[in-house]
């Protein structure tokens, strides 16, 4: 079943602003031609307009394709079996596409919640799905502990200030013995499977370094913490960690890898502005024209097959054991 997204804004330039701006100023602010949410300003660095929503849906398709090739369980949506009427929570749910597909997959049984700072989800949704404007780093005082079968996170790097605290809240609200956290992230630092010198001197590498510096300066690091598995284990989880190599363009020989690369290239291409404007213009102070020129050069570098460039996707499957955790 299709669910139309109808309550987001199309990207417009400053000269195209509507005459009556009161309707959108309560929810959005316009910067560099992109709309950003006004709830807890600065908490989330990416925009929330239609271009960004399309990008998130493209990335959802990328994740499904990748996991169907690399981890072919449950249509690529999740990894472990769930009960017949599962209780599901999606943190940073974005457009709500994962939550809605999870509800459809379970035939309307169980309950699915999605939390996000920005309400960019459809108004027409399955009856067992609900979306809430909420900061998942705030205390979960009104949420029943020991209640969720799965808590899902995807692409949250760059929006979390305190990972151990968030993981501890997740731990306390999963069902002991069966509930699990499923977290999917991308390490956005490009690497080369060939001669590393062209990539090291490229605009793509310059972009990555600047974006990571900007996110770090904002207090929300974009890079994958190499000790994530250890942090989860210290809290009490039993953890599986899988790494998947994702080419930036279809240079691999395997057709499955080529398909993954095409979707990844499309998603990253559409997301360059979103990842760059706040982090590099606002937090590092670079002028907008210079940043836009950098983005155009990055798009060229992303398509150079001879560089054999790739990023790494991380999947963490963290189950809460029946016995109490050590810290959470």
Language-model features: where?
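Short amphipathic alpha-helical segments embedded in low-complexity Lys/Glu-rich regions
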Residues: 46, 72-82, 116, 189-191, ...
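Conserved catalytic/acceptor-binding region of the Class I
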Residues: 158, 180-271
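Short N-terminal helix/helix-N-cap motif within the alpha/beta-hydrolase-1
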Residues: 160-162
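A short glycine-rich, Lys/Arg-flanked "PGG" loop and its adjoining helix->strand segment in the class I
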Residues: 164-180
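Class I SAM-dependent methyltransferase Rossmann-like catalytic core
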Residues: 5-85
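C-terminal lobe and adjacent flexible extensions of AdoMet/dcAdoMet transferase-like proteins
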Residues: 235-238, 243-328
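Class I SAM-dependent methyltransferase SAM/SAH-binding core
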Residues: 85-142, 150, 165
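Short SAM/SAH-binding signature in class I
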Residues: 146-155
């Amino acid at each position: 079943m299709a669910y139309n997204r109808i309550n987001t804004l199309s990207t417009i330039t400053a000269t195209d602003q509507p005459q009556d701006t009161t309707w959108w100023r309560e929810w959005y602010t316009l910067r560099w031609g992109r709309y950003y949410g006004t709830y807890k300003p600065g908490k989330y660095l990416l925009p929330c307009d239609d271009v960004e929503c399309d990008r998130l849906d493209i990335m959802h398709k990328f994740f499904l394709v990748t996991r169907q090739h690399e981890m072919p369980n449950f249509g690529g949506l999740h990894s472990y079996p769930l009960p017949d009427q599962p209780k599901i929570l999606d943190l940073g749910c974005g457009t709500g596409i994962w939550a809605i597909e999870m509800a459809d997959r379970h035939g309307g049984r169980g309950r699915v919640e999605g939390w996000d700072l920005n309400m960019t989800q459809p108004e027409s949704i399955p009856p067992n799905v609900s979306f809430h404007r909420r900061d998942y780093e705030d205390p979960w005082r009104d949420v029943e502990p020991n209640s969720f079968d799965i808590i899902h996170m995807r692409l949250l790097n760059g929006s979390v200030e305190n990972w151990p605290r968030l993981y501890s809240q997740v731990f306390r609200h999963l069902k002991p013995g069966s509930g699990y956290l499923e977290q999917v992230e991308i390490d956005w630092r490009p690497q080369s499977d060939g001669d590393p010198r062209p990539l090291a001197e490229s605009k793509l590498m310059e972009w990555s370094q600047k974006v990571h510096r900007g996110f770090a300066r904002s207090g929300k690091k974009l890079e994958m913490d190499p000790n994530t598995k250890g942090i989860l284990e210290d809290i009490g989880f039993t953890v599986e960690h899988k790494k998947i190599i994702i080419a930036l363009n279809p240079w691999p020989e395997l057709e499955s890898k080529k398909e993954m690369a095409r979707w990844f290239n499309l998603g990253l291409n559409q997301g360059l502005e979103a990842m760059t404007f706040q982090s590099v213009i606002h937090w590092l102070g670079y002028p907008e024209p210079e940043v836009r020129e950098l983005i155009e050069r990055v798009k060229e570098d992303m398509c150079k097959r001879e560089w054999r460039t790739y990023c790494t996707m991380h999947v963490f499957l963290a189950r809460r054991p029946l016995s109490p955790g050590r810290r959470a």
